Amino acid sequence: QICTNCCAGRKGCSYFSEDGTFICKGESNPENPKACPRNCDGRIAYGICPLS
C-alpha cells in the first residue's frame, strides 16, 4: 500500500484501489510539484505510470 493522494500523485500516473478500481490520475508534475496535502488517501493501493 502506497501513501499518496490524487493531488500529490505523479502526473500521468493512474491510481487504483486494492481491488483494481480506478481512483484517479495523479496531478503533480515532478518538475514543478503542486502544493498538495501530504495525507494518504486510504483508497489508493497502487499506481501505474507510463515508462516515459
From Swiss-Prot:
<keyword id="KW-1015">Disulfide bond</keyword>
<feature type="site" description="Reactive bond for trypsin">
    <location>
        <begin position="38"/>
        <end position="39"/>
    </location>
</feature>
<comment type="similarity">
    <text>Belongs to the protease inhibitor I20 (potato type II proteinase inhibitor) family.</text>
</comment>
<keyword id="KW-0646">Protease inhibitor</keyword>
<feature type="disulfide bond">
    <location>
        <begin position="6"/>
        <end position="24"/>
    </location>
</feature>
<keyword id="KW-0722">Serine protease inhibitor</keyword>
<feature type="disulfide bond">
    <location>
        <begin position="7"/>
        <end position="36"/>
    </location>
</feature>
<feature type="disulfide bond">
    <location>
        <begin position="3"/>
        <end position="40"/>
    </location>
</feature>
<feature type="modified residue" description="Pyrrolidone carboxylic acid">
    <location>
        <position position="1"/>
    </location>
</feature>
<dbReference type="GO" id="GO:0004867">
    <property type="term" value="F:serine-type endopeptidase inhibitor activity"/>
</dbReference>
<keyword id="KW-0873">Pyrrolidone carboxylic acid</keyword>
<protein>
    <recommendedName>
        <fullName>Proteinase inhibitor</fullName>
    </recommendedName>
</protein>
<keyword id="KW-0964">Secreted</keyword>
<dbReference type="Pfam" id="PF02428">
    <property type="entry name" value="Prot_inhib_II"/>
</dbReference>
<dbReference type="InterPro" id="IPR051391">
    <property type="entry name" value="Protease_inhibitor_I20"/>
</dbReference>
<dbReference type="InterPro" id="IPR003465">
    <property type="entry name" value="Prot_inh_I20"/>
</dbReference>
<feature type="disulfide bond">
    <location>
        <begin position="13"/>
        <end position="49"/>
    </location>
</feature>
<dbReference type="GO" id="GO:0005576">
    <property type="term" value="C:extracellular region"/>
</dbReference>
